[in-house]
């Protein structure tokens, strides 16, 4: 699958995979000066890229495992969604869960993009839902022994 992508700045780096079988494409910061993210603070970091995600797909913006586990930096909304009709700059709301300030520099890997198919659905309002063994059992209800 090919995705049309546009560099909005000369310094923007195209998404890149860390290995040939990686599902995620690394997204890189494109900032004119270093950005300091204080502990428990969120800052919007641009990538300098815009793209055309094909209809029937969305771009999921996920944390990079090492960046979140080792340094406490992750997308603030846990998973960002880039819809197929969005044409603006791809940005990452990066949150610092750590206890020390973190400096983000240009061309640094900040998140990963996974292109995911989805189904378009319609919702059918009903008065009653079908019964299941689980019923209305919610959080933790299936983990009990």
What is the predicted function of each stretch?
Residues 1-145:
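DUTPase catalytic domain/fold
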């Amino acid at each position: 699958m090919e995705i049309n992508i546009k560099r909005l700045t000369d310094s923007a780096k195209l998404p890149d995979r860390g290995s040939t079988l990686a599902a995620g494409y690394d997204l890189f910061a494109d900032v004119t000066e270093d950005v300091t993210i204080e502990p428990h603070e969120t800052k919007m970091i641009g990538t300098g890229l815009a793209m055309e995600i094909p209809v029937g797909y969305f771009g999921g913006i996920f944390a990079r495992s090492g960046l979140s586990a080792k340094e406490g930096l992750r997308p603030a909304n846990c998973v960002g969604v880039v819809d197929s009709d969005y044409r603006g700059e791809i940005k990452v709301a990066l949150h610092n869960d750590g206890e020390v300030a973190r400096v983000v520099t240009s061309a640094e890997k900040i998140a990963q993009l996974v292109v995911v198919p989805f189904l378009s659905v319609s919702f059918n309002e009903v008065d009653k839902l079908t019964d299941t063994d689980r019923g209305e059992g919610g959080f933790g209800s299936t983990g009990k022994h």
